[in-house]
From Swiss-Prot:
TM annotation in the entry: 41-61, 125-141, 153-166, 208-228, 279-295
GO BP terms, alphabetized: photosynthetic electron transport in photosystem II
Gene (UniProt): psbD
Highest classification ranks of the organism: Eukaryota, Viridiplantae, Streptophyta, Embryophyta, Tracheophyta
Protein name, entry field: Photosystem II D2 protein
Binding annotation for a plastoquinone: H215, F262
N-acetylthreonine found at: T2
Subunit text: PSII is composed of 1 copy each of membrane proteins PsbA, PsbB, PsbC, PsbD, PsbE, PsbF, PsbH, PsbI, PsbJ, PsbK, PsbL, PsbM, PsbT, PsbX, PsbY, PsbZ, Psb30/Ycf12, at least 3 peripheral proteins of the oxygen-evolving complex and a large number of cofactors. It forms dimeric complexes.
EC number(s) on file: 1.10.3.9
CDD domains tied to this protein: Photosystem-II_D2 (cd09288)
Record membrane topology: Multi-pass membrane protein
InterPro entries (UniProt xref): D1/D2, Photo_II_D1/D2_sf, Photo_RC_L/M, Photo_RC_L/M_CS, PSII_PsbD/D2
GO molecular function: chlorophyll binding; electron transporter, transferring electrons within the cyclic electron transport pathway of photosynthesis activity; iron ion binding; oxygen evolving activity
Stated family: Belongs to the reaction center PufL/M/PsbA/D family.
Length: 353
């Protein structure tokens, strides 16, 4: 008996094949299957943000002005989180809160959930786009894996943290000054700077910046095919097509500087990938911990001694007092519905912390 092995061919393409051919066609802007998620979500997220920062007030949710229409500028405008009373409602336009009324939906903070959810799926779509293109041109998927780090940070800060708290109210609003206020909130209520996961994140981001600067300078320093452009300094031609720097020379240089150096390009570039991605992932895990109100380092012995001995003080105990001041000021301002009334003697007074 003879068995013929071969690929099964269809006489005519079905709808999937037609869609696949159109979506993945080589064009100026690649669409792909991931584009079905990326482009609509990115469009709605950016459109919602521009709409909110231009027209929508935060008076009903935070008692604040937050739009260009009210006099804010690029640094102070924001799309604000919903009120605390709305808890974790998705705030759908057709939901029980807004009941299809667009103006009421904006007043309630519906644009924030709209931007946050479409933004999250837009970022995921961008990562899938990198997977799809890498597969199409037979590359490894490390670009997509690296991009998972900022996605993890976004999801942990904007979605998981408020899900662990009482509502979307405690997430950051989408604006520059709003993010700064959220950072102060994190410090005052969670002592975030003393959290080991934050420390790993800082080490990852700053370490990556250092590696990037060193790597770029080293490659430029060890070019062995000089450019001859009249408008720039020698040995630098940004349009040079081929790779003409000396890894051996770079290795000798850094071996003399540090005593150690990367021996090959693969290990060097993997390390440049590993440092920032690991740092961002660690900080994302730390924010998940804050969602559950896990504490940072507590040096209680220093606090007790500082309370007993007026002459004993450390930078740690000063920071703890500063955090208490942040909490005392922010809690009453940010949560007026709680009717938090602090007696005058516990409120911070200028520098007398």
């Amino acid at each position: 008996m003879t068995i013929a092995l071969g690929r099964f061919t269809k006489d005519e393409n079905d709808l999937f094949d037609i869609m696949d051919d159109w979506l993945r066609r080589d064009r100026f802007v690649f669409v792909g299957w991931s584009g079905l998620l990326l482009f609509p979500c990115a469009y709605f997220a950016l459109g919602g943000w521009f709409t909110g920062t231009t027209f929508v007030t935060s008076w009903y949710t935070h008692g604040l002005a937050s739009s260009y229409l009210e006099g804010c500028n690029f640094l102070t405008a924001a799309v604000s989180t919903p009120a605390n009373s709305l808890a974790h409602s998705l705030l759908l336009l057709w939901g029980p809160e807004a009941q299809g009324d667009f103006t009421r939906w904006c007043q309630l903070g519906g644009l924030w959930t709209f931007v946050a959810l479409h933004g999250a799926f837009g970022l995921i779509g961008f990562m899938l786009r990198q997977f799809e293109l890498a597969r199409s041109v037979q590359l490894r998927p490390y670009n997509a894996i690296a991009f998972s780090a900022p996605i993890a940070v976004f999801v942990s800060v904007f979605l998981i943290y408020p899900l662990g708290q009482s509502g979307w109210f405690f997430a950051p609003s989408f604006g520059v000054a709003a993010i700064f206020r959220f950072i102060l909130f994190f410090q005052g209520f969670h002592n975030w700077t003393l959290n080991p996961f934050h420390m790993m994140g800082v080490a990852g981001v700053l370490g990556a910046a250092l590696l990037c600067a060193i790597h770029g300078a080293t490659v430029e320093n060890t070019l062995f095919e000089d450019g001859d452009g009249a408008n720039t300094f020698r040995a630098f031609n940004p349009t040079q097509a081929e790779e003409t720097y000396s890894m051996v020379t770079a290795n000798r240089f850094w071996s003399q500087i540090f005593g150690v150096a990367f021996s090959n390009k693969r290990w060097l570039h993997f390390f440049m990938l590993f440092v920032p991605v690991t740092g961002l992932w660690m900080s994302a895990l730390g924010v998940v911990g804050l969602a559950l109100n896990l504490r940072a380092y507590d040096f209680v012995s220093q606090e007790i001694r500082a309370a007993e001995d007026p002459e004993f003080e450390t930078f740690y105990t000063k920071n703890i007092l500063l955090n208490e001041g942040i909490r005392a000021w922010m809690a009453a301002q940010d949560q007026p519905h709680e009717n938090l009334i602090f007696p005058e003697e516990v409120l911070p007074r200028g520098n007398a912390l």
